[in-house]
């Protein structure tokens, strides 16, 4: 007998190729760096929850989902998973041309301009915990095996201001780790609640993946899904 699955987040769309969900803040997208398969599978992550969902309680089922992109643990909003490795690879190979992502963020301070953009090369620290902007890389001088800085572009538009903060709509032209958080922090306007990058403590990280627009890998149709923003980001 198959057990019923009550997911801790809503499914926004599902078909034979994809699952689109509204991930809550505080939930890992995928496992952290824990050694061993059993340890990875025991972690409470969106990936593991959806693996259990597609297997419908059948322990021997080989069905699973594939990671296409990530959201930080503290970030809520729209996420997409593939139901096959082939579909996942299609998106990974041409992510910038097949998708458009829009975020909402509340940042410290008052942004004077109505809109703007940040562009820099981002580099992860050796342990992968933090990210920072660095000079454009010179491949000829890079030590063998060293991490390579990757170009990142963040476009934003001011929506409103309140209590010494600014609500912004953000569009990513690239999808680098912690990209929005790093760019606004380095501009002197860290995301509210982002203690990792210099923001003041708050009830949550005020960053939300508002919408995801993508070209369906099978039909070629453009589709868009939205996750309602939480309190403080409306």
Walk through the language-model features, giving the residues of each.
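RNA pseudouridine synthases
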Residues: 1-234
């Amino acid at each position: 007998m198959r057990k019923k699955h009550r997911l801790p987040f809503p499914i926004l769309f599902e078909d034979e190729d994809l699952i689109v969900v509204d991930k809550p803040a505080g939930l890992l997208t995928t496992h952290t760096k824990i050694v061993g398969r059993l340890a990875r599978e025991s972690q409470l992550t969106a990936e593991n929850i959806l693996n259990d969902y597609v297997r419908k309680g059948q322990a021997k089922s080989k069905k699973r989902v594939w990671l296409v992109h990530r959201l930080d643990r503290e970030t809520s909003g729209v996420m997409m998973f593939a139901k096959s490795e082939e579909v996942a690879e299609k998106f990974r190979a041409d992510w910038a041309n097949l998708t458009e992502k829009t975020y909402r963020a509340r940042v410290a301070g008052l942004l004077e301009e109505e809109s703007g953009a940040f562009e820099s090369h981002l580099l992860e620290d050796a342990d992968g915990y933090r990210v920072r902007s660095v000079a454009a890389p010179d491949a000829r001088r890079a030590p063998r095996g060293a991490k390579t800085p990757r170009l990142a572009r963040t476009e934003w538009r001011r929506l409103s201001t309140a209590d010494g903060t600014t609500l912004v709509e953000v569009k990513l032209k690239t999808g680098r780790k912690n990209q929005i958080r790093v760019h606004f922090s380095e501009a002197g306007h860290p995301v509210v609640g982002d203690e990792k990058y210099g923001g003041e403590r708050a009830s949550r990280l005020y960053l939300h993946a508002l919408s995801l627009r993508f070209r369906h890998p099978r039909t070629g149709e453009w589709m868009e899904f939205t996750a309602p923003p939480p309190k403080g980001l409306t």
